[in-house]
Amino acid sequence: MSMTFRRISFLAAPLALSLLCLGLTGCGLTVRQQAAISKFSATTAALAGQVEDNLVQTRNDVVALRTGMLALDAGTVDLENTSADLDAGLNVDELETRLKAAGALKRFGMMLETLATDTQSGELQAASDQFVASLRQVQGVNLSEAKAEAIGQVISKVGGLWINARRKKALQRVIVETRQPLQTLANLVAHDFNVTNEQWLAVLTATQDEINDSLQSQMEFVAEGKHTNPEDDKSPKWKESEVTLRQDRYQALKLEAAARVKRAELISERMLRSVAGFRGAHEDLFVIIQSNKVTLDKIDGYYTEIDSLIRLSKILAAKERK
C-alpha cells in the first residue's frame, strides 16, 4: 500500500464518520429520545402553567372570603377605599416570588426543547440565558456563578459539523448541571401546595378557620332583641329581618369557604403527585438520553399526572361558573 493511499484513507475516515453522524441518529439523538425530550418539555411547561394559575387562584380565594367577612355588616365592600389588608400573607410581592419558580420551570422545558431540536446557535444561547436568568431570580435556589457559566458554555459549544453528537452531550451535561437547582424548584412548589405546611395554602385554610371560629363567636351576639354592640347598652337592638339577613350571609360565606378550601385540597393532592412525577421524569431523562433501550414509563407517568391535573382544574372551574 502506497503512502499516498494510506494518507487519503486516514483523512477519509473522520470525514466519513462525520457524514454518518450528520445523516444518521446513532451519533446523536434518536427519534425516540427526541420524542421523550419533547414530551418532558411540553409537560413541564404545562406544570408551570398550572402552578401559576393555582397560585393566583388561591390568592383570589382568600381575597374573596375576606371581602365576604367585611360584607356581613354592609352587604357590599368598597374595595378601592377599604383599609383592610385583604391579601395579607398572599400579597403581590409574595405571589411574584412564587411565580418566578414556575417561570424557571417553564424556561427549563423550553431550553431542553430548543437544545434537542434547534440548530441555530443564537436560539440555543438565548434559551439558555433565559433559563439561567429565570432560575437565579428564585429565592431559595443557589446557582453559583461557576454552574451558571458551565450551563452557558455547554450550550454555546453546540454547533458545527458534529451538531447531533454535540447536542446529545450538551443535553447530558445540562441535565446533570441543573439537577440540584431543579429539584430545589420542585421542593419549593411542593411546599407551597402542601396543605399541612404554613405557606401559601395555609393562608386559605386559616381564613376558613377564622370564619368558622372567631366569626362564629361574633355571630352568637346577632339575635333579635340583643344590642348590636354588646358592650354598649344604648346601641340599637337587632331586628328580626336584620338577624335573618346577617345569618343568611354568614351561612353562605361558610359554604363558600368550604367549597374554596375543598377545591384547593383537591388541586393540592394532584399538584404534589405532578411534582413527584417531574422529579422522577427529570432523573430518568439523563438515562434515556444515554440509552435508547430505557423505557419512558416515568415520563409517560409524569404526562398522565399533569393531564389529570389540567382536567381537574377545568372541571372545578366549570363548577364555579354554574
Please state what every model-predicted region is.
Residues L22-G26:
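C-terminal motif of bacterial Sec signal peptides marking the signal peptidase cleavage site
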Residues R32-A146:
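N-terminal Sec/ER secretory leader and immediately downstream segment
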Residues L29-R32, A36-T43, G89-K100, A116-E123, ...:
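Non-transmembrane, amphipathic alpha-helical segments
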Residues R270-K322:
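Hydrophilic extracytoplasmic domains
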Residues Q139-A276:
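Extended amphipathic alpha-helical interaction segments
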Residues S2-L15:
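Bacterial N-terminal signal peptides that target proteins for export
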